Amino acid sequence: MYQPPTGVRDLLPLDVSQKLWIEQRLQRVFTRWGYQRIITPTLERMETLQASGSVDLQAILQLRDAEGVSLGLRPDPTPSLARAVATRLADAPLPVRLSYQMNVFRSTTQPQEFYQAGVELIGAGGVLADAEVLLVLAECLAELAPPDWTLILGAVAFTRSWLAQVAEPARHRLRRAMAELDRVAILAEAGIDEAVRSQLLLLFDLRGEPEMVLSKASSLPMSDAQRAELAELETLTGWLRGRSVPVVLDLSLVEAFDYYTGLIFEVSAGGRLIGRGGRYDHLLGSYGKPAPGAGFALNLEALQQVLLPTGKLPGRTVGGGFLVVPDGPDAWEAALAEADKLRCAPGERVEIELLGRTGEEAIAHGRALGAAVVRWVHPDGSTTDCDLAVIQ
């Protein structure tokens, strides 16, 4: 009782301090590359979320407003940003570079709320735009330095072309099996051509060093469009490896959201999936403004978990500053004036002792707060300092 609903949690001061540490570093990278921050509503009309037909309605937490309009909590930032660009930024010069830090909500077996940060590059297509998005992501990861991070690239059109040979609903089941790397489900699926089954199983082996994967893939029967997509992957991996970005190819990679049209990618670190993204050239057309787009989202909770063992994150809430202690009831006005004066320094943190602690109790409390100095203020305005760094 009196706990948050299953799937959501309180962020306590230390959680917030660590989250802010991550967000600030990501925002610095976003700004350096010219991405401007945008904040979209947490609630969207269901028709907005449904417009592309690519978001699973079962994943959306739905409600109605007082007028009976069906609303949904955003399950993904990208459709909301696409809607904003197609409407509020319709006349903006292209390409539009946007960044965000926001919470998203998904309903699977239980509601979930989590935080994401990412960028969207809208109005530019092709391999150069894909490269920019990947390089922004790589710079974010270099800034944070999570352990053993790897960028995993895939080609959604290449993979879908094999699935397109299978009719629904078997196609949906096979797509899910590929997303979950479930070979058994593919073997068990009845009523599909054995040659197609063999090709789908072969895709599981098309993962690893780019040269090896591209060599194996070149032996498959492919359309010109598929060969062009693999050629772009070869170009991208060459550029990334030239910048010492750890990258592998995975031609079995598929994503939960069905709006991706070309490049797709994931990033893992410390054995966890910490981000994903890709190209979505048809999404903005769903909102009346056709334009290519690409972007990525990093999961802030996952980043926090992989960074914790590294010791990079703050181990305590923001420390330093002053604990101002009035030396008796007659010193209150002088203590308030002293605290006001201290707060004039940029970024200074000042707390006032409110519970009458004195002497060693005040020192112990200051240490618990992480204060640098306990300052007693006397009725005449004079002060006495205890430097906690000296006495520890």
Swiss-Prot record:
It is found in: Cytoplasm. PROSITE patterns: AA_TRNA_LIGASE_II (PS50862). GO terms for cellular component: cytoplasm. Its main location: cytoplasm. The keyword Transmembrane does not apply. One of its GO terms (molecular function) is histidine-tRNA ligase activity. The keyword Lyase does not apply. Keywords: Amino-acid biosynthesis, Cytoplasm, Histidine biosynthesis. One of its GO terms (biological process) is L-histidine biosynthetic process. Pathway: Amino-acid biosynthesis; L-histidine biosynthesis; L-histidine from 5-phospho-alpha-D-ribose 1-diphosphate: step 1/9. It holds the Pfam family tRNA-synt_His. Heteromultimer composed of HisG and HisZ subunits. NCBIfam families: hisZ_biosyn_reg (TIGR00443), PRK12292.2-3 (NF008940). Belongs to the class-II aminoacyl-tRNA synthetase family. HisZ subfamily. Required for the first step of histidine biosynthesis. May allow the feedback regulation of ATP phosphoribosyltransferase activity by histidine. This function is generally fulfilled by the C-terminal part of HisG, which is missing in some bacteria such as this one. This is ATP phosphoribosyltransferase regulatory subunit. It comes from Gloeobacter violaceus (strain ATCC 29082 / PCC 7421). The gene is hisZ.
